[in-house]
C-alpha cells in the first residue's frame, strides 16, 4: 500500500530532490510530500593536492553528479518499478567557501581552491581589519584578494565568482544564484538587507582600486536568495548534463543552492533563534542562531547565516575525538594481551559509560587533546598531554571523564565569549557526530559543559542531502507567510522531539573546577609545544 502511494507521489511530481557535494561523497536524497526519504543515490570522490592547493576537477564534479543521479534513479526503479523522469522541486548543496572563477564565456580561469586551503593568511587578516568583521582564511573573498595581491594573470578576466553549489546550480539552471547561508561564506552579509554588505563591498573596491581591474566586486558576485525563493528551473542543457540518457525532463523548479552548514542546520531542525547544533567528531563546532548580531568582532567566532538569513555564530575547534581514539587503542591492546580479542564498539560504550561514574571534577586529572593547534586558546600547534597532581585520584572512571571533558573544553572557551560577553541565550542544542554515539553519555556531559539542554535525534544522521531536499520541499510546499522554522517544526519534525538531556548541576559544577585547572595548565601545553619536537 505504501509503495503504491509513493509511486503516485513520484508520478504526480510531489517529490523533492536534494543533491549535496560533500568532501568525500556526493549524495542524493529524494523525499515525498511528507518529507520522508523514499530513494537515495551516491558517489564517492576525493580532493587532490596539486601544486600545493587542495582541489577538485570540474569534470569530476559532473562524473559524480551523473553517477549520483543514475544510482538514485536506479533506486527508484528497483523499489517502485517506474522510471524517474521528473521531480517536483530540486536543490543543490555543497562544501562552502573556496574559490571558483569564470570568464564571460563561462570558462574556468583558475583551479578550484577548496575551503581546506590555508594560504590566505595575509588577506584574511587585512580584510578582517578593513571590514571590522572576522574573515576566515577559507572564505571566497580572502581567496580573491590573495589572487589580486599575487598579481595572478587571470584576475582581469573574471566575470563570475561562485561556490561549488553555486556553480552546479548555474550549470543546471543558467541562473547565477546563491542561497544566503552559502553567500555568507563568500562575503559578509548585511542582516537587514539579506544581501552582501554594500559598505564592505565599497571598501574592498577601494582597496584594489590601484589595480585598475575592469570589474567591481558587485559585478562578479552571484544574486543572493533566501530559503523559499524560486531560483530558476532545470534547462534542457542542464537536464542532459545530469542525465545523459535523456529521460530527465527540463522545467523542474530549483530552490537557492545552499552550503553544507545551512543544510546541516535544516537537517537538525536548528534554524530558529536561540537554537543551535553541536557537531562532534574529529573536530568539533557549534552553530548558534542569534537574536541579534554580535556587538564586536571576535577572531574565535565566524559569522554566517541560516538559509533564511538569521545571523549565526560559529565556534570551530580543530580537535575533538582523535586523542580519545588513541587512548581507546591503548586499552584495546591491553585487553587483547589478556583475552585475545575485543569488541571495539563495546569497548567505546564501556569507556564512555564508565565516565559517568567518575568524580564530577575528574578527581584532579587533566587532559589536553591538541593533536593540532587551537586558535580558540591561542595555539598554532599542539601536543597531546595527560597530567595529574600527586594526590589526584587515578582510576578508570576519573580518567575516562577527563578524556571526554577534554574533547569539549576548547569549545567552551568560544561559547563563553557568546554567553558571557554577548549574553547570548540558547534554549536547546542538537548534538550529532561520533561523540554522541554511545546513548546518553556525550549528551549528558555536553549539557553540563555548555549548561544547555542537548537533544539527540535519530534523523541527525540523514545529513545535508536531506537538508537541501527539505529546502526544495519548503519552496514548493510552504503556506503563504510560513517561516522555515515553522515549516520544519510542523511538517518535518513534528512530534520527533528526540532525546533531551538537561544539564545536571553537580556535573556542571565539576566541569567548572576542571576548567579552572585546564586554564592554569595551558602553560604546560605551551611549554610542550615550544620544547617537544
Q: What is each residue range found by the language model?
A:
Residues 43-45, 226, 503:
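Active-site donor-binding loop signature of nucleotide-sugar glycosyltransferases
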Residues 54, 58, 62-65, 92, ...:
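Generic structural signal for well-ordered secondary structure
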Residues 1-111, 125, 157, 218, ...:
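N-terminal glycine/serine-rich phosphate-binding loop of ATP-dependent small-molecule kinases
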Residues 42, 114, 500:
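Conserved beta-strand positions that form and line the central face of beta-propeller blades
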Residues 117:
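Carbohydrate-associated surface elements
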Residues 77-114, 134-136, 169-181, 185-190, ...:
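Short beta-strand-loop/turn "lid" adjacent to the catalytic site in phosphate-handling enzymes
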Residues 2-11, 17-18, 122-138, 142-178, ...:
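Active-site core segments that coordinate phosphate-bearing ligands/cofactors
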Amino acid at each position: 500500500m505504501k509503495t503504491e502511494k509513493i509511486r503516485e507521489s513520484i508520478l504526480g511530481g510531489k517529490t523533492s530532490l536534494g543533491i549535496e557535494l560533500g568532501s568525500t561523497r556526493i549524495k542524493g536524497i529524494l523525499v515525498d510530500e511528507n518529507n520522508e526519504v523514499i530513494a537515495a543515490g551516491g558517489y564517492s570522490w576525493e580532493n587532490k593536492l596539486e601544486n600545493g592547493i587542495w582541489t577538485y576537477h570540474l569534470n569530476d564534479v559532473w562524473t559524480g553528479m551523473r553517477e549520483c543521479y543514475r544510482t538514485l534513479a536506479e533506486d527508484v526503479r528497483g523499489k517502485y518499478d517506474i522510471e524517474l523522469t521528473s521531480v517536483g522541486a530540486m536543490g543543490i548543496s555543497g562544501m562552502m567557501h573556496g574559490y571558483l572563477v569564470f570568464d564571460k564565456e563561462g570558462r574556468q580561469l583558475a583551479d578550484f581552491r577548496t575551503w581546506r586551503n590555508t594560504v590566505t593568511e595575509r588577506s584574511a587578516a587585512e580584510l578582517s581589519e578593513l571590514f571590522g568583521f572576522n574573515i576566515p582564511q577559507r572564505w571566497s573573498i580572502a581567496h580573491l584578494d590573495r589572487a589580486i595581491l599575487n598579481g595572478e594573470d587571470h584576475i582581469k578576466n573574471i566575470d563570475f565568482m561562485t561556490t561549488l553549489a553555486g556553480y552546479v546550480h548555474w550549470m543546471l539552471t543558467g541562473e547565477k544564484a546563491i542561497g544566503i547561508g552559502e553567500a555568507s561564506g563568500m562575503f559578509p552579509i548585511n542582516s537587514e538587507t539579506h544581501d552582501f554588505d554594500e559598505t564592505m563591498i565599497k571598501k574592498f573596491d577601494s582597496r584594489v582600486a590601484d589595480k585598475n581591474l575592469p570589474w567591481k566586486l558587485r559585478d562578479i558576485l552571484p544574486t543572493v536568495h533566501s530559503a523559499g525563493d524560486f531560483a530558476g528551473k532545470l534547462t534542457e542543457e542542464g537536464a542532459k548534463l545530469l542525465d545523459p540518457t535523456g529521460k530527465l525532463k527540463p522545467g523542474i523548479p530549483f530552490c537557492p543552492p545552499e552550503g553544507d552548514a545551512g543544510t546541516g542546520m535544516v537537517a537538525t531542525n536548528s534554524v530558529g533563534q536561540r537554537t543551535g547544533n553541536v557537531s562532534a567528531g574529529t573536530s568539533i563546532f557549534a552553530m548558534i542562531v542569534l537574536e541579534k548580531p554580535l556587538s564586536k568582532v571576535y577572531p574565535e567566532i565566524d559569522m554566517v547565516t541560516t538559509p533564511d538569513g538569521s545571523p549565526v555564530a560559529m565556534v570551530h575547534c580543530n580537535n575533538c575525538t582523535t586523542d580519545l581514539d588513541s587512548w581507546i587503542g591503548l586499552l584495546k591492546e591491553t585487553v587483547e594481551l589478556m583475552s585475545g580479542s575485543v569488541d571495539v564498539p563495546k569497548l567505546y560504550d564501556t569507556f564512555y559509560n564508565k565516565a559517568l561514574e567518575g568524580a564530577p571534577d575528574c578527581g584532579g586529572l587533566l587532559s589536553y587533546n591538541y593533536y593540532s593547534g587551537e586558535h580558540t586558546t591561542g595555539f598554532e600547534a599542539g601536543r597531546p598531554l595527560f597530567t595529574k597532581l600527586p594526590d589526584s585520584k587515578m582510576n578508570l572512571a576519573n580518567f575516562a571523564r577527563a578524556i571526554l571533558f577534554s574533547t569539549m573544553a576548547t569549545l567552551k572557551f568560544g561559547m563563553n565569549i557568546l554567553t558571557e560577553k554577548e549574553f547570548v541565550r540558547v534554549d536547546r542544542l542538537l548534538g550529532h557526530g561520533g561523540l554522541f554515539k554511545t546513548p546518553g553519555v556525550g549528551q549528558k556531559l555536553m549539557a553540563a559543559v555548555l549548561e544547555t539542554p542537548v537533544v539527540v535525534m535519530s534523523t541527525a544522521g540523514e545529513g545535508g542531502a536531506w537538508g537541501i531536499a527539505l529546502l526544495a520541499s519548503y519552496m514548493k510546499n510552504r503556506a503563504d507567510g510560513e517561516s522555515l522554522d515553522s515549516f520544519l517544526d510542523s511538517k518535518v519534525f513534528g512530534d520527533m522531539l528526540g532525546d533531551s538531556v538537561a544539564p545536571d548541576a553537580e556535573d556542571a559544577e565539576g566541569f567548572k573546577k576542571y576548567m579552572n585547572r585546564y586554564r592554569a595548565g595551558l602553560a604546560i601545553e605551551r611549554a610542550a609545544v615550544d620544547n617537544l619536537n
